[in-house]
Amino acid sequence: MKMTRRAFVKANAAASAAAVAGVTLPATATNLIASSDQTKITWDKAPCRFCGTGCSVLVGTQNGKVVATQGDPEAPVNKGLNCIKGYFLSKIMYGKDRLEQPLLRMKDGEFHKDGDFAPVSWDKAFDVMAEKWKAALKKNGPTGVGMFGSGQWTVMEGYAAVKLMKAGFRSNNIDPNARHCMASAVGAFMRTFGIDEPMGCYDDFEHADAFVLWGSNMAEMHPVLWTRITDRRLSHPHVKVNVLSTYYHRSFELADTGYIFEPQSDLAIANFIANYIIQNDAVNWEFVNKHTNFKQATTDIGYGLRDNDPLQKAAANPNSGKMTDISFEDYKASVAEYTVEKASEMSGVSQDDLIKLAKQYADPNIKVMSLWTMGMNQHTRGVWMNSLVYNIHLLTGKISTPGNSPFSLTGQPSACGTAREVGTFSHRLPADMVVANPKHRKIAEDIWKLPEGTIPPKPGKHAVAQDRALKDGTINAYWVMCNNNMQAGPNINTERLPGYRNPDNFIVCSDPYPTATAQASDLILPTAMWIEKEGAYGNAERRTQAWYQQVKTVGEAKSDLWQIMEFSKRFTVEEVWGEELLAKAPEYRGKTMYDVLYKNGNVDAFPLSEAQELNDDAQAQGFYVQKGLFEEYAAFGRDHGHDLAPYDTYHKVRGLRWPVVDGKETLWRFKEGSDPYAKKGSGWDFYGKPDGKALIINAPYEAPPEVPSDEYDMWLCTGRVLEHWHTGTMTRRVPELYKAVPDALCYIHPADAKARGLRRGDEVLIENKRGEVRVRVETRGRNRPPQGLVFVPFFDARILINKLILDATDPLSKQTDYKKCPVKITKVS
């Protein structure tokens, strides 16, 4: 066989590299290297499938399969970098137990609640599913059905789901798993600014003089963003990094000062900083007088528990979000009690360190970026805590300018773009609209071409309330999509599993893998993943990114979008709408929900010829469904402060940060000259509020619902580790990631271990009144809790640690507190 000089050089280079690595190439390997037709890899862009950072990756496909991924060097978010999970994206779709066909619990050839899973056709799956939905609707009306979605849905999938539930079934019982991670951030944005999502952007990392992490281990949870902080800190000696947490973790390694505080005492620390700013005459009066109002939050609001729970019954103002007007003097008097002495006593942080932190906020010459994730949001006073940090930035005027940014980070790839912007929460509609507002409902009904009164005005059941309703039998048909709540959610044994196994209920789980949730369900629908479909995500800095389908899915798996739309064909309008509503739109008689919701002249406006050839969803519908859904959804936000670019634009760029007006993205919102919605001459314009002013909201320290006792003497905190993402559905199927961290461990202080006769690697029983788990202890390594607290990650399906978590929530946001519950720890003999 002849070999060209070029091929000879390439082959020798490969052989040399192999020799260095200790590998012997067979003689025929030179042929493989030289034959470009057989080794050609096709590359295209896509946002990463994991966290809310929104890194762009280049995806390499060959012979219909993803074979490689790499960081996208043209991406402004990650600039070519990936984290360890991102580098193994090519393997997440190819786990050995990938689901390829629908599975239904069967006995004697028919569905049976206690039957074994058996393969069925999609038609059979939807026949049984539709029968159960119709029975639930007949029994309890629209509130008898529910849906639990995801911040991992694409924008189009979430939007289609909102239409299916709120307009089709006329049920607001739809909520995303982002309720567990971002609801408190949303609540505080809406209360403080009247509009959701961060005012700053990632460019702030290159401008800030000080970084303050409030309950965020960015080194492991947002590692690419952490590289930008690291670069800023190491390149500019004046820059300071501050890390606040209830335990020591990897982010402390870069910190100039680390602050380990008692659980829940962050409320006291934030109020102390506000008091320090006032007492040291560091208030930016020009900003405060022109751009803020003061409010008092209602206190003693309970813990979002069942109404008959003693803790809930004891609250003076359960679940109240009411606020009253106060003056600056009232606010000053209220925070005055949070002296450095009191804050130090409550938190366990030294007075010197507290003052050091407060000075960085108070100094007008120091630009401060505050960052937080679950440590602040998963908190029974999470909305308050978010607001208290906004108070600090508003008092000093350190907001909406480069480097001055209170920044709520997100954990899922489209918790912002889908859960929040699309409005898949039980109380929301797209673009910050809410179902309780008749004007907002009218806007949605007009865009969707529906008769007035279609959308019900009462918010539906949120995530935790859905569990309770399933257990109580008031929701009987339930669809879980793109999440693993049986592992991730709180209080599994008491409140969730009983509802799934309630014989009156029918539970459907759409997932690519047999998760804990899937195995507890009655019907499992196999789902297409990531670039097996076309979609769009929205990241933490308001950046919307789109991607094309790049490979076909496996077996009979279908996208969530296809499943939603196909299921809608099983219902006529007469079966889901009352006669009174039908009388307003007689032209819809005899039509299916699919006809009314998805073939309405908007969604089906763009022909199939505009789509890429490889687009299974578009081919199935006969029109460019992703573009149609996106453009109809975008109509909600245009001229409303949430402007999106035309859909086709997103395929040409590495994302754009909304609002996008006249083709230009917005970096800093609310700032004149940067935000097109900020009025000329305003300086700052918080236009989410009618008067353009943000709120400084006074809220005190209030204790958590449970504290350690003689019997349950340790705090338990649950969370994540670098190598795994959430419940490990994808990462535990990547061999390299699984081998790196195969098991969840109980990280414990050596003194606490010694007091219990424990050595590193011993198996322990962690228990409280909600359940127990067995896990091995770790006294060294990346996570080092203080005495009295243990940390256990929740990625390990064999150790369902979240079964111990109380289903207490922030009463305002309905978000669960995973960061503090009492347990006892004993050695397994």
Swiss-Prot record:
Its cofactor is [4Fe-4S] cluster; Mo-bis(molybdopterin guanine dinucleotide). One of its GO terms (molecular function) is 4 iron, 4 sulfur cluster binding. This is Periplasmic nitrate reductase. CDD domains: MopB_CT_Nitrate-R-NapA-like, MopB_Nitrate-R-NapA-like. The keyword Metal-binding applies. The lineage of its organism: Bacteria, Pseudomonadati, Pseudomonadota, Gammaproteobacteria, Vibrionales. It comes from the Bacteria. Binds 1 [4Fe-4S] cluster. Residues 41-97 form the 4Fe-4S Mo/W bis-MGD-type domain.
